């Protein structure tokens, strides 16, 4: 067990669980993705944490913790989400080991096992888009969040190495998300390749996902519940 894991309590207080349930996260996913609560007891020893994050660790208190797993199942970073009103709404902490790993939210050991077994992979942005679509799709698919509307070389290498099924990209419905998904022409008139084409270039089957009813999958669920979610993604499910 590393320092970061020791700093997370996986026994969520009621306000943490209530917050996650209100965002549409099922109890099954709360356990599977190992949502936790900041409970730091010892001082960090990791050089990256000491150099970059030590002064902000107290801001993690009172926030729900979203572990960021390596493909081997080790927690290499966290996202800390505020329950209400605090800014910024999310904080991130990465350990030295995170530098050598693809960083996704949603990549639990159980999700990794399903990817190896041939599950389709959906790529979204944030953690609540992960949990919302995982709720809809069930265990035949794994939903991973890149935490911003882009993929890194490490993301692409991971997908090429592990995915046997199809890939679907369902980024946010804003300009940034759609441009990143489909590609765009930049201010200098140069063509910029989108995430769908980058993944297709790996030799994988990759499709863009178009939906209506909200700026992202979680907003659709918040606006209309499971029925609205099912309707929005009926072409793909």
What is the meaning of each model-derived region?
Residues 1-65, 69-72, 112-116, 200, ...:
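TOPRIM metal-binding catalytic domain and adjacent DNA-binding surface shared by DnaG-type primases
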Residues 39-166, 181:
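Phosphate-handling DNA/RNA-contact segment within nucleic-acid enzymes
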Residues 47, 157-163, 216-230:
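Short, surface-exposed amphipathic charged segments that create phosphate/polyanion-binding patches used
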Residues 123, 165-185, 209-210:
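Acidic beta-strand-to-loop metal/phosphate-binding motif
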Residues 143-149, 204-214:
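RNase H-like polynucleotidyl transferase catalytic core
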Residues 179-202:
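Short, aromatic/basic amphipathic alpha-helical patches
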Residues 208, 228-237:
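C-terminal or mid-to-C-terminal helical accessory/interaction module adjacent to the motor/catalytic core
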